[in-house]
Amino acid sequence: MYLYTLILLFLASANVNAYANPGACSGNCWTHDPGLYQRKSDGKYFRFATGGGIHIASADSLEGPWTDDGYVLPSGSIIDLDGKTNLWAPDLHYHDGTYYLYYAVSSLGSQNSATGVATSKTMEAGSWTDHGTTGIESTPSSPYNTIDANWIAVGGTQYVNFGSYWNNLFQVEMENGLKVKSGATPHQIAYNASGIHRQEAAFMFERNNYFYLTFSGGIALGYNDTWPAPGEEYFIAVCRSTSATGGFVDKNGVSCLNSGGSLLLSSHDFVYGPGGQGILQDSSKGFVLYYHYADTRIGKAVEDYQFGWNQLKWENDWPSV
């Protein structure tokens, strides 16, 4: 909890020039909790976002121009829970010739949640098949909330990271891209002990024999009603480990299970509350951090959020923006 307080104090006093501004974006630049993937066949970019049946946008470059292509699941999910027509937090991966998209079915403040999955050969609108629940589900008696799924494969083993608030971030082994492994039990990989445990949006990736766990912390929404106190808005942090299944620590060696986390990106210049992040291994730009943010020159409502991206820089195997 003490370390998490230090992060908030640093956010409130950070040099506004410490970060590079987001890369250029033209066309449809709205997004929320983006998922981003580059098609294997031709390098075209597809960007997915929270809302409706998961928004789809596409472009031939990260800079755009981005076009609005419709929805992954125009009629919503076949999972019968509140929120089935307003899906959240898309996560993309490619495996054995198929694109997989994980999505969350839930409602604000509820643990009645499930992680669903849809598949496609192209990522184009109209090409997606909904397979319903992965078996990653939660109820009010669960220690976690099964939203914000993120897939990673290590050798021949697949895992999904998930979680938001409650006891924060968990991981579970998958049988395949569609279903959780029979008998698998989720285990905790990160926890923020302070306040109401504002931690979510796990995204894990591998580089140079390290596994990096990025996540979002702080207040994610409601900026159109009240600005949070300086430093309490959304931000992105990172820990790393030599194992994908645990042992994550920050730059100071503090465990991510004990409120650890090194700041990766926070508010600066016109960028406010960056979060809902992921990492794209771009064919030409290398590791790219992508996220949504409120542009203070445009507006602070969710409807005004913008697509942000930055190429990561590296020092001593730690990323920076």
UniProtKB/Swiss-Prot annotation:
Keywords: Carbohydrate metabolism, Glycoprotein, Glycosidase, Hydrolase, Polysaccharide degradation, Secreted, Signal, Xylan degradation
Catalytic residue positions: 33 (proton acceptor), 200 (proton donor)
Primary location recorded for the protein, binned into one broad class: secreted
Pathways per UniProt: Glycan metabolism; L-arabinan degradation
InterPro entries in UniProt: GH43_arabinanases, Glyco_hydro_43, Glyco_hydro_43_endo_a_Ara-ase, Glyco_hydro_beta-prop_sf
Single Gene Ontology MF annotation: arabinan endo-1,5-alpha-L-arabinosidase activity
Site keyed Important for catalytic activity, responsible for pKa modulation of the active site Glu and correct orientation of both the proton donor and substrate: positions: 148
Localization (cell): Secreted
Signal recorded as keyword: yes
EC numbers: 3.2.1.99
Gene Ontology CC annotations of this record: extracellular region
Reaction equation(s) it catalyzes: Endohydrolysis of (1->5)-alpha-arabinofuranosidic linkages in (1->5)-arabinans
A biological-process GO annotation: arabinan catabolic process
Glycosylation sites: 192, 224
UniProt signal peptide: 1-18
Gene3D superfamilies: Glycosyl hydrolase domain, family 43 (2.115.10.20)
Role of this protein: Endo-1,5-alpha-L-arabinanase involved in degradation of pectin. Its preferred substrate is linear 1,5-alpha-L-arabinan.
Family: Belongs to the glycosyl hydrolase 43 family.
Name assigned to this protein: Probable arabinan endo-1,5-alpha-L-arabinosidase C
Organism: Aspergillus fumigatus (strain ATCC MYA-4609 / CBS 101355 / FGSC A1100 / Af293)
